[in-house]
């Protein structure tokens, strides 16, 4: 375990140097890993584990997702099973179903958690809010987590490029004395570049805050506010979109990712530099109270309850689709669709 200084704070980090793939294979050589769910994280994690030489099976209900698993090379009756059968065969159960689905199938999973098995998560929601989800594992199994900091699609594509995605990890329950080794081996096996230590609660709180904040909710709100302001002041849709979204995603974000915002501030025009320095304070002051309110809503379980209650309503899917359609049909994103078509690589 390496100790890395992040901005003056030392954290425990596991890298491929400390825990190489060969060691991971040795740790898990007698294990059968069942990946439950072939939706968001399931395909990337299961295929990466398979390609890295681990003994992997998939548990998935019949339907379109089951058919997708077959297309990806999983063989019904050999490496692709019902959720119940996969749980029976596994020594490590990767519980990668959606939060709502985890609540639904938990009785089946729990019934097959015999002593010594490991229950693996990639998100701490079900455990952190187990007073609401009723996902309470027996005391004689390991309960562990590796949470990739990106989508399952990114996990797979970076793996195929010979790279890796960063992940957090946590040990909730070590019944066998092997929980940490199992966690490290699985993290390396799914293609993590490096792993930093956290807890189930902290992963859940930061993840839910991020999704509702800068990763999705806040950025959509911020982009829309600027786009609307430009449109209301006479700017055309294409100009408003290019100045709000296109320049951000195509020019600035790649540099932001490679070199950091501090580098961008030091390497832009003097006009942009002065304006950015002057206005970052007002934007910080305007949004900080919103983030504090959001974090409190996450930490108290309010956001979890909203999610659970919403998903349990019989008409939720219909209403959700209507919300998503409204977003899709909005002027800003219809403009974006045309702007993307006009990019040189798409012409």
List each model region and its residues.
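Small-residue helix-packing motif on alpha-helices
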Residues: 66, 86, 102, 237-241
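NAD(P)+-binding Rossmann beta1-loop-alpha1 motif at the extreme N-terminus of oxidoreductases
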Residues: 2-77
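Rossmann-fold dinucleotide-binding core
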Residues: 120-212
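Active-site-proximal catalytic alpha-helix in oxidoreductases
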Residues: 177-232, 238-256
């Amino acid at each position: 375990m390496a100790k890395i200084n992040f901005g003056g704070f030392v954290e425990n980090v596991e890298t491929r140097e400390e825990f190489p793939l060969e060691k991971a294979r040795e740790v898990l050589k007698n294990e059968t890993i069942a990946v439950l769910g072939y939706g968001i994280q399931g395909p990337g994690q299961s295929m990466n584990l398979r390609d890295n030489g681990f003994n992997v099976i998939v548990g998935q209900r019949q339907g379109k997702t089951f058919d997708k698993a077959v297309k990806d090379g999983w063989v019904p009756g050999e490496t692709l099973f019902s959720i119940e059968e996969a749980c029976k065969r596994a020594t490590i159960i990767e519980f990668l179903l959606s939060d709502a689905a985890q609540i639904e199938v938990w009785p089946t999973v729990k019934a097959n958690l015999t002593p010594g098995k490991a229950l693996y998560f990639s998100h701490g929601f079900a455990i952190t809010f187990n007073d609401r989800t009723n996902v309470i594992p027996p005391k004689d199994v390991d309960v562990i987590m590796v949470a990739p900091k990106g989508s399952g699609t990114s996990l797979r594509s970076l793996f195929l490029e010979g790279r890796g995605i960063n992940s957090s990890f946590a040990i909730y329950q070590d019944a066998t004395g092997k929980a940490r080794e199992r966690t490290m081996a699985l993290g390396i096996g799914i293609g993590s570049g490096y792993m930093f230590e956290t807890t189930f609660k902290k992963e859940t709180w930061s993840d839910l805050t991020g999704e509702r904040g800068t990763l999705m909710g806040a950025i959509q709100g911020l982009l829309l506010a600027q786009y609307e302001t430009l449109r209301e002041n006479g700017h055309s849709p294409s100009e408003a979109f290019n100045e709000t979204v296109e320049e951000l995603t195509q020019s600035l974000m790649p540099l932001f990712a490679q070199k950091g915002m501090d580098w961008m501030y030091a390497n832009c025009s003097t006009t942009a530099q002065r304006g950015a320095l002057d206005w970052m304070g007002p934007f910080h002051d305007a949004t900080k109270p919103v983030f504090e309110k959001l974090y409190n809503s996450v930490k108290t379980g309010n956001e979890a309850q909203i999610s659970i209650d919403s998903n349990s309503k019989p008409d939720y899917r219909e209403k959700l689709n209507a919300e998503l359609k409204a977003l899709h049909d909005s002027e800003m994103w219809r403009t974006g669709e045309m702007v993307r078509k006009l990019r040189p690589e798409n012409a």
